[in-house]
UniProtKB/Swiss-Prot annotation:
This is Transmembrane 9 superfamily member 2. GO terms for cellular component: endosome; endosome membrane; extracellular exosome; Golgi apparatus; membrane; microtubule organizing center; plasma membrane. Belongs to the nonaspanin (TM9SF) (TC 9.A.2) family. Pfam families: EMP70. Ubiquitously expressed. Especially abundant in pancreas, highly expressed in kidney, lower levels in heart, brain, skeletal muscle and placenta. Lowest expression in lung and liver. It is a multi-pass membrane protein. GO terms for biological process: ceramide metabolic process; glycosphingolipid biosynthetic process; protein localization to membrane; regulation of heparan sulfate proteoglycan biosynthetic process.
């Protein structure tokens, strides 16, 4: 069973000096994952049964999580399948992030004693009579799950139990999940894990992995009297048709279930467990062997270098404009009494009387800016905490919990920004503004999320959010976020309107006919290309984490890409804004928001490409769920990038018109 495997279906989401040091510690490299335990996830000590105490346990509990598949967006709880169930045991409490991600951790019937070897121990036996409708339904669900390659996810001491095997490129891959079973097609083609053994050869037959060999590695605590700590748990799934079910010996042919089987079918579930001391692995670095088999770090460095090249290119362009062109423009404007010739050459000064003219649909723009500010700050703080190790994979659900809590608490800056800009746009309907800021964008996201949840409920998936959790989310929104938004809006409207460096003329200036490149749409389309070029490699790993259930842990890289994205959006927008001002087009507000916000359209196009080229998802429900959740991500990303572009352009316009003399 240790035969080499091809790659199976992917396994399963400027404080310069200080910041540089933090990022260097957070960027993953060889043996770097020890930083994951900064928040103080306490280790558990284990002892032999005769030495156990309150500080040193002998019993090792194995927990089971939801089962998922790369061929379906629908995960299912362990109890949805007809596997061996725990007779007793308390279900661990789950945080908000775990519930939103669909994690359902439950106790299992697999119980171990530290350092006690067990061989072919029977867990339970399941019997099916194909003539009984209930049994047939259970068996068909099991077959369908094997056909879609659903994967178990087991947990020991808050660590995933991994299945390690060789892949085609000679690398050792450790999968934090293992399949229920596999299928040989009616043409004799081995699907998924059926390639691991030549014993799986019967056509149109399912083979269920009803036995696991588990090996638990431990490291003795250096003090000696404190027992040992678990540093790894690995398993190998196997299939046996036990001849003596009451006394299984874990030998013989594999457990096959023909697609046309009838009569009585018995499946005995067994396991073997052994323990091995490993003094090379420390508890703080026990995730390394899993993370080092994840997508290669050098690809991430290529992504960073690619992004930095784009940033340097844009920075050079912006620096040339700011330091050379604008400097000369301003000097010549300020020196000339008769500016007729200068106006023909330097067009951006001509629009000084219209540059701060309120935009059309100023209400909507201010609402978008408020929500975008909320998302921008939330993303920055979440990624910063993730870099420090507080939101590592070991701290399950912490990333989503942190993001949701921050979004709720950041209602105040959202209301403040929306109110300040709406007032500067000359708006007077402050009640409408604050209500839209509180409910428009969050309402769209929640409506989409609720529709997706209805589909999950209908499919019986574990990813369906319980009614109580939905009520809790609504309570956080209405009882905390909305009042905080009103408070922020109150202070925003109370302050004086933003003072602009130049006065606005009463009569709008006529905008001359624009060339193709200075028209709004071409500029907006071009503006999103470079920011997207900075993130598309990182985007691949993020989508893999969400849809292919791979473990994402490279938050140092992600934070660097976040900073680069902010810089790129800002510089690309400033660059295009300058060209449009030189063409005497002063409608910069919406254009600046849409220029960088158009990056989200490229995100959507890439997500569509990813769905058809990388995923193996089948089924109408899974397809709707994929694109439904993708639209939520696209909207959030649109508000995030659009807000960056607007603020950058607002700063640029304010800066250049504040240093030029205007009669």
């Amino acid at each position: 069973m240790s035969a080499r495997l091809p790659v199976l279906s992917p396994p399963r989401w400027p404080r310069l000096l200080l910041l540089s040091l933090l990022l260097l510690g957070a960027v993953p490299g060889p043996r770097r994952s020890g930083a994951f335990y900064l928040p103080g996830l306490a280790p558990v000590n284990f002892c032999d049964e005769e030495k156990k105490s309150d500080e040193c346990k002998a019993e090792i509990e194995l927990f089971v999580n939801r089962l998922d598949s790369v061929e379906s967006v629908l995960p299912y709880e362990y109890t949805a399948f007809d596997f061996c169930q725990a007779s007793e045991g308390k279900r661990p409490s789950e945080n908000l992030g775990q519930v939103l991600f669909g994690e359902r951790i439950e106790p299992s019937p697999y119980k171990f004693t530290f350092n006690k070897k067990e061989t072919c121990k029977l867990v339970c036996t399941k019997t099916y009579h194909t003539e009984k409708a209930e049994d047939k339904q259970k068996l068909e669900f099991l077959k369908k799950s094997m056909l879609l390659n659903y994967q178990h996810h087991w947990i020991v001491d808050n660590m995933p139990v991994t299945w390690c095997y060789d892949v085609e490129d000679g690398q050792r891959f450790c999968n934090p999940g293992f399949p229920i079973g596999c299928y040989i097609t009616d043409k004799g083609h081995a699907k998924d894990a059926c390639v691991i053994s030549s014993d799986f050869h019967e056509r149109d037959t399912f083979y269920i992995f009803n036995h696991v060999d588990i090996k638990i590695y431990y490291h003795v605590v250096e003090t000696g009297s404190m027992g040992a700590r678990l540093v790894a748990a690995k398993l190998e799934p196997k299939s046996f048709k036990h001849t003596h079910i009451d006394k299984p010996d874990c030998s013989g042919p594999p457990m096959d279930i023909s697609n046309k089987a009838s009569g009585e079918i018995k499946i005995a579930y067994t396991y073997s467990v052994s323990f091995e001391e490993d003094d090379k692995i420390r508890w703080a670095s026990r995730w390394d062997y899993i993370l080092e088999s994840m997508p290669h770090t050098h690809i991430q460095w290529f992504s960073i270098m690619n992004s930095l090249v784009i940033v340097l290119f844009l920075s050079g362009m912006v620096a040339m404009i700011m330091l050379r062109t604008l400097h000369k423009d301003i000097a010549r404007y300020n020196q000339m009494d008769s500016t007729e010739d200068a106006q023909e050459e330097f067009g951006w000064k001509l629009v000084h009387g219209d540059i701060f003219r309120p935009p059309r649909k100023g209400m909507l723009l201010s609402v978008f800016l408020g929500s975008g500010t909320q998302i921008l700050i939330m993303t920055f703080v979440t990624l910063f905490f993730a870099c420090l190790g507080f939101l590592s994979p070991a701290n399950r659900g912490a990333l989503m919990t942190c993001a949701v809590v921050l979004w709720v608490l950041l209602g105040t800056p959202a209301g403040y920004v929306a109110a300040r800009f709406y007032k500067s746009f000359g708006g007077e309907k402050w009640k409408t503004n604050v209500l839209l800021t509180s409910f428009l964008c969050p309402g769209i996201v929640f409506a989409d999320f609720f529709i997706m949840n209805l589909i999950l409920w209908g499919e019986g998936s574990s990813a369906a959010i319980p009614f109580g959790t939905l009520v809790a989310i609504l309570a956080l929104w209405f009882c905390i976020s909305v009042p905080l938004t009103f408070i922020g809006a109150y202070f925003g409207f109370k302050k004086n309107a933003i003072e602009h460096p130049v006065r606005t003329n009463q009569i709008p200036r006529q905008i001359p006919e624009q060339s193709f490149y200075t028209k709004p749409l071409p500029g907006i389309i071009m503006g999103g290309i470079l920011p997207f070029g900075c993130i598309f490699i990182q985007l691949f790993f993020i989508l893999n984490s969400i849809w292919s259930h791979q473990m994402y842990y490279m938050f140092g890289f992600l934070f660097l890409v976040f900073i680069i994205l902010v810089i790129t959006c800002s510089e690309a927008t400033i660059l295009l804004c300058y060209f449009h001002l030189c063409a005497e087009d002063y409608h910069w507000q919406w254009r600046s928001f849409l220029t960088s916000g158009f990056t989200a359209v490229y995100f959507l196009i890439y997500a569509v490409h990813y769905f058809f080229s990388k995923l193996q998802i089948t089924g109408t429900a899974s397809t709707i769920l994929y694109f439904g959740y993708t639209m939520i991500m696209v909207l959030i990303f649109f508000l995030f990038t659009g807000t960056i572009g607007f603020f950058a352009c607002f700063w640029f316009v304010t800066k250049i018109y504040s240093v030029v003399k205007v009669d």
